[in-house]
From Swiss-Prot:
GO biological process, one term: lipid A biosynthetic process
Active site annotation, chain numbering: H360 (proton acceptor)
Involved pathway(s): Nucleotide-sugar biosynthesis; UDP-N-acetyl-alpha-D-glucosamine biosynthesis; N-acetyl-alpha-D-glucosamine 1-phosphate from alpha-D-glucosamine 6-phosphate (route II): step 2/2; Nucleotide-sugar biosynthesis; UDP-N-acetyl-alpha-D-glucosamine biosynthesis; UDP-N-acetyl-alpha-D-glucosamine from N-acetyl-alpha-D-glucosamine 1-phosphate: step 1/1; Bacterial outer membrane biogenesis; LPS lipid A biosynthesis
The protein's name: Bifunctional protein GlmU
Region of interest (N-acetyltransferase), ranges: 248-453
Record-level GO cellular component terms: cytoplasm; membrane
E.C. number: 2.7.7.23, 2.3.1.157
Cytoplasm as UniProt keyword: yes
Pfam annotation, one family: NTP_transf_3
Gene: glmU
EC class name: transferase
Subunit structure as annotated in this protein's UniProt entry: Homotrimer.
Binding of Mg(2+), residues: D101, N224
Essential cofactor(s): Mg(2+)
């Protein structure tokens, strides 16, 4: 049987007080609606439909390249009206209705719900809450069968005492929805077409309503304002931290730690406070990450030490390297075994050989360093001529003195030595000493000029 997933993402989200559509606000570094789309992909959806309205062009742009069909809800007239915009595109098989601002729903929960659905059964995800707040309530008969769902604003005092709540997540068939949605009425307190009214229609036809519940209420938490967004972010990060702790990762403080992508850790990894991991990050056995470090789309091999306040992006780091503090590794950086990039050093598109050291206050970009190289403080590879980038090639065991400018394209042969304060613009042969600076002049007894009174 086919599966259509419908994601409702047309709301304005006025309480977010933002020009950006609510579903595009980021949770763990990814738009809310993208989390839901990822879940739909895990379910193996035949077709995925995103109902858009407010900020439609922004949503379409953000989701460009994803396998989705867009349906426009020009006027927001309720959830039933939103789903109705997709009717012409739906198959007759199973249909799952999700929400673009409910990002943490799990595929396992939805699979259990979908397993309940056929032409004689409708599926509804419910959750029991101590404080139901503004949620719709599940009304059951004496035999425990669901007879209808009443929205909070339309509920009586007795109905508001019910703690089993509607999550809004519904599983039905396309045939059922095509029959029921055109019959919806807007005669209610909100003046909207409620999707939930289809449950009364199902009951009238003798169609059973099967219910399922999430493993945690966190799965069905929605976002309406910045406070809820922040709370959901922290809940999500707590969950990620607990998983890592269970896997044996040592976190200095699980409450001060963010994963905004995929993080894989080996044995005996230590992560200090305030660290952020974005994209696809791998930390090998025994890696230590110092406080307030950002690592994005990088692989860090076993035994590497990363000191505080370092930024590592798009880098490959081999075993037992040492990075930081206050180091910045930009995309294309590859550090070999036991190499070192120290404080206030920036690298970009650079290969640093085994045991080589760039200890402090340097920029090394578009460069290749062999093994055993020492780069003195204040060394700069001058790689850009205003139009094009050029490479610097440094052989094994080269020693570069402090405050040196290497004007690319330039090559330093193996074992070469560069005197401190030099500006090197021509190749240096292997084993040679190159010094390129003006001769010092000293005037004894020099008296500085004084201002006239």
């Amino acid at each position: 049987m086919t599966l259509d997933v419908v994601i409702l993402a047309a709301g304005q989200g006025t309480r977010m007080r933002s020009a950006k559509p609510k579903v595009l606000h980021a949770l763990a570094g990814k738009p809310l609606v993208s989390h839901v789309l990822d879940t739909a992909e895990q379910l193996g959806a035949t077709r995925t439909h995103v109902v858009i309205g407010h900020g439609a062009e922004q949503v379409e742009t953000e989701l460009d390249g994803r396998d989705v069909r867009f349906a426009l809800q020009a006027e927001q007239k309720g959830t039933g009206h939103a789903v109705a915009q997709t009717l012409d595109e739906l198959g007759d098989g199973k249909v799952l209705i999700l929400y673009g601002d409910v990002p943490l729903i799990r595929a396992e929960t939805l699979t259990a719900l979908l397993d309940e659905v056929d032409e004689r059964r409708l599926g509804l995800l419910t959750v029991t809450l101590d404080d139901p707040g503004g949620y719709g309530r599940i009304v059951r008969d004496a035999e425990g069968r669901v007879t209808r769902i009443v929205e909070h604003k339309d509920a009586s005092e007795a109905e508001r005492g019910i703690t089993e709540c509607n999550t809004g997540i519904v599983a039905a068939t396309g045939t059922q929805l095509k029959r029921w949605l055109p019959q919806l009425s807007a005669e209610n307190a909100q003046g909207e077409y409620y999707l939930t009214d289809i449950f009364a229609m199902a009951a009238a036809e003798g169609i059973e309503v099967a219910t399922a519940s999430p493993a945690s209420a966190l799965e069905v938490e929605g976002v309406n304002n910045r406070s809820q967004m922040a709370a959901l972010e922290r809940a999500y990060q707590r969950d990620r931290a607990e998983r890592l702790l269970t896997e044996g990762v040592a976190l200095a403080d699980p409450a001060r730690f963010d994963v905004r992508g995929r993080l894989q850790c080996g044995h005996d990894v230590f992560i200090d406070v305030g660290c952020v991991f974005e994209g696809d990050v791998t930390l090998g056995d025994g890696v230590s990450v110092g406080p307030y470090t950002l690592i994005r789309d990088s692989h860090v091999a076993a035994g590497t030490v990363i000191e505080a306040h370092s930024i590592i992006e798009g880098a490959e780091v081999a075993e037992q390297a040492h990075i930081g503090p206050f180091a910045r590794l930009r995309p294309g950086t590859r550090l070999a075994r036991q190499s070192k990039v120290g404080n206030f050093v920036e690298t970009k598109n650079a290969e640093v050989g085994e045991g080589s050291k760039i200890n402090h206050l340097s920029y090394v970009g578009d460069a290749s360093l062999g093994g055993g190289v020492n780069i003195g403080a204040g060394t700069i590879t001058c790689n850009y001529d205003g139009a094009n980038k050029h490479r610097t090639e440094i052989g094994d065991d080269v020693f570069v003195g402090s405050n040196t400018a290497l004007v690319a394209p330039v090559a330093l042969g193996a074992g070469a030595t560069i005197g401190a304060g030099s500006t090197i613009s021509r190749d240096v042969e292997a084993g040679a000493l190159a010094v390129a600076r003006t001769r010092q002049t000293t005037r004894a007894g020099w008296k500085r000029p004084r201002k006239s009174s």
